[in-house]
Amino acid sequence: MVKSMRTRFDEQLRQLNVELIRMGSLCEEAISIAAKVLEGEKNISNERVFAIEGEIDQLEHDIESLCMRMLLQQQPVASDLRVISAALKMISDMERIGDQAADIAELCPYVGDTLAQGRLHITNMARAAVSMVTESVEAFVQGDLKMACKVVQDDDKVDELFLKVRAELISCLKEEVGDPEAILDLLMIAKYFERIGDHAVNVAEWVEYSITGIHESNEHHPQNVL
């Protein structure tokens, strides 16, 4: 009986990994499409981002249900509990990534051709964010602590790019260059990409917790949570 329960748990764990990879892939797609809409790429519609957001929301619900079944029907040991609780935290951040990609897509039509250089920095922010999401999910599936730590470090690049964009856009506002409303919308888009990077870091930190039992928020007073 114990063996069959463990076998069933391992099957559910594989399913959890598959669904997390799918959710991460959708987040990556949403970010990439939003960036292409911002760049004005033809044959790309922000409606696709809104559709992906709905798929991400559904996956969050599905993964929550799977995790609850794993907790209620199986007999997870401490390390298993860390994996399940980390997954529940991760999907919350990935759902927010989907929301913010949709927020970006909604603002894109209003920015026009505002500040080409600033848009280049934002495109680079988007690329970095996609990479961070990819690596954070891969780190969870592979149990790769080093990769999770790399994601946390990579957030500095996104933050630096955001500061550059903000400085350039504030300068435009002061010098009255361009449409002020479009500039503010572009600044908000940059802020959403910066927040996406923060959510990817949150995911990576929960990966670290799933492996070590220690969460980054407790770094000054480390303790084994489970």
Question: Could you describe each region identified by the protein language model?
Answer:
Residues 1-226:
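Cytosolic, long alpha-helical scaffolding segments
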